[in-house]
Regions:
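N-terminal amphipathic/hydrophobic targeting modules at extreme N-termini
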Residues: 3, 16-18, 28-31
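Short polybasic linear motifs
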Residues: 19, 23
Length: 260
């Protein structure tokens, strides 16, 4: 109750406005880009990102299924990690309108520079403990989104205030490590006021699969959904049939929502 009152109070709006102005002083204005892929907000059409692609077969299957963005993991401990050079080869297979998302976790300046030099990334995904200032510093004016590791009592308002200049917020489950655990979080715990205000740049992740993505879309109406382990036959191994079925489930959910 207190959170809902806070979200609608005049005092909260004033604090939010001051925080945004302070953020501009620290990291500059949030870059606005016209995305053809992942972050094109189009009511009635949920965008789809498939993350952790590692081979040309993965990329070709995702594109054939109608994906809007593919994610490449630049985090060596991950079983889905790829090198910048491999990512560059895979990105060259993408048609116009499909975003190449670069996922990094607490990358050093040198690591980030190597990725940027090799691969044509169109959207950066900061999935570690990066501060807003660090995200803006690394992205250097390029589009970026920040992953939120959502657990019990997660402070949604604080997060969106802190990272208010991100192009998108990616909601993932709080698990050991940094994502890819295939564990959903409690979508009902997301405050409706927060959803209403931020839905045009919310990317929902965390344990999505062909069986639950329809419910997730019906509840939250996110701009996009993000899947990785939910379309795998074993850890790190994507399945073309599951990728196609996942996107079909998203389109079915969109059609159902539009008809209501």
């Amino acid at each position: 109750m207190a959170g809902k009152l806070l979200a609608t109070s005049k005092g909260y709006r004033e604090v939010r406005a001051r925080t945004k102005e302070r953020a501009k002083e620290i990291i500059g204005p949030r870059p606005y880009h016209s995305f053809m892929g992942l972050l094109t907000h189009s009511p009635g059409r949920t965008r789809v990102k498939i993350c952790g692609l590692m081979s040309s077969a993965d990329v070709d299957s995702a594109v054939s299924a109608g994906v809007d963005a593919v994610g490449f993991v630049f985090y060596p401990p991950s079983v889905r990690a790829v090198s910048p050079n491999i990512a560059a080869q895979l990105i060259s297979r993408l048609p116009a309108g499909v975003d190449a998302v670069g996922l990094v976790v607490n990358a050093t300046d040198e690591q980030f520079a190597a990725i940027r030099a090799a691969a044509s990334i169109t959207l950066w995904q900061f999935h570690g403990d990066e501060t807003p200032e660090r995200c803006a510093q690394l992205a250097a004016g390029e589009p970026w989104m920040k992953a939120a590791r959502v657990g019990t009592g997660f402070a949604f308002d604080d997060f969106s205030l802190q990272y208010g200049h991100a192009n998108a917020f990616l909601l993932d489950a709080l698990v050991e490590g940094y994502g890819g655990g295939g564990v959903p979080f409690d979508w009902q715990g997301i405050p409706q006021t927060w959803v209403s205000e931020n839905a045009p740049r919310v990317v929902l992740s965390g344990g999505l699969n062909v069986h639950n993505v329809g419910e997730a879309i019906a509840r939250l109406h996110p701009c996009a959904v993000d899947v990785s382990s939910g379309v795998e036959i074993s850890r790190g191994v994507k399945d073309p049939a599951l990728m196609a079925q996942f996107i079909q489930a998203v389109r079915a959910a969109d059609a159902k929502t539009s008809s209501q």
